[in-house]
């Protein structure tokens, strides 16, 4: 009876071996889950924004994974002996984790530094911000007249501080902001790649080759998507009935992701406050 029992297998997608007595090893085990977390981020952004650029980046990420799958079976280099003896599956050259995060970091950096140019949006935001500031100034004058000079001045100071904070939060990222974000992505990618050698899943050579392959795939994919955009092919694809049915758009190149729907929300918020003020006046 016992001989007929099928031996169990583990799902290695999130199965990470680490040293429980080493806190750095535990951190590296969590870093090993970054690619899975990024896939969740991709899926969430695609579903919530329907942005063509996000879809293109995820398509490139999948193509990079396919290249890693092919390279591993072409090179057929084993993993380090220590991890191989514990049951580590698959070939080790190049590191799929290193290739995945390298593609993501480089592709994100190329988008933020070379493709994302929210110029027109910045001008529109500045005009709308000035209009909101004029309305707030009128409100401040009324408040000062009603509450007296002392209370009104304090209220005006607090309102001005809130306005400055709101203006900063709603401004599109400058090149310096985008550079820092790109640098942060590279640091995270480097940490994930380093964790693979620390845990013993790959040799340094396998990780470096993975980083190089991911970087090469990201640059090549950026060139491909640039040609697709410049040739007008992307615009034609976005006009397909099926694509329009899914409401795919291409705004993030010139618009920040948080900006989508913000003007509509602001208009509704202002309209709601005006209705409340009219009710109070009655």
Curated annotation (Swiss-Prot):
Keywords: Endoplasmic reticulum, Hydrolase, Membrane, Transmembrane, Transmembrane helix. It holds the Pfam family PAP2. Its main location: endoplasmic reticulum. One of its GO terms (biological process) is protein N-linked glycosylation. Its EC number is 3.6.1.43. The keyword Transferase does not apply. GO terms for cellular component: endoplasmic reticulum membrane. It catalyses: a di-trans,poly-cis-dolichyl diphosphate + H2O = a di-trans,poly-cis-dolichyl phosphate + phosphate + H(+). The chain crosses the membrane at residues 26-46, 93-113, 173-193, 207-227. The keyword Hydrolase applies. Belongs to the dolichyldiphosphatase family. This is Putative dolichyldiphosphatase.
């Amino acid at each position: 009876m016992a001989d007929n029992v099928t031996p169990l297998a583990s799902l290695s997608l999130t199965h990470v071996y680490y040293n429980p007595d080493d806190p750095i090893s535990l951190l590296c085990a969590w870093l090993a889950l970054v690619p899975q977390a990024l896939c969740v981020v991709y899926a969430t952004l695609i579903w919530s924004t329907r942005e063509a650029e996000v879809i293109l980046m995820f398509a490139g990420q999948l193509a990079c994974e396919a290249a890693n799958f092919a390279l591993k079976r072409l090179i057929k280099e084993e993993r380090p002996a220590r991890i191989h003896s514990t049951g580590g599956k698959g070939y080790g050259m190049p590191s799929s984790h290193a290739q995945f995060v390298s593609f993501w970091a480089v592709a994100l950096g190329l988008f933020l530094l070379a493709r994302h140019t929210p110029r027109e949006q910045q001008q529109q935001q500045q005009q709308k911000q000035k209009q909101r500031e004029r309305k707030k100034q009128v409100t401040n004058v009324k408040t000062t007249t009603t509450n007296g000079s002392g209370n009104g001045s304090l209220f005006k100071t607090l309102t001005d501080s809130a306005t400055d904070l709101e203006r900063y939060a709603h401004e599109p990222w400058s090149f310096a902001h985008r550079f820092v974000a790109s640098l942060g992505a590279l640091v995270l990618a480097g940490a994930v790649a380093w964790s693979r050698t620390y845990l013993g899943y790959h040799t340094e050579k396998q990780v470096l080759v993975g980083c190089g392959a991911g970087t090469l795939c990201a640059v090549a994919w950026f060139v491909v998507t640039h040609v697709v955009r410049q040739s007008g092919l992307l615009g034609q694809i976005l006009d397909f009935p099926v694509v329009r049915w899914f409401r795919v758009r291409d705004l993030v190149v010139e618009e920040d992701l948080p900006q989508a729907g913000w003007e509509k929300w602001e208009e509704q918020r202002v309209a709601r406050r005006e209705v409340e003020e009219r009710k109070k006046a009655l």
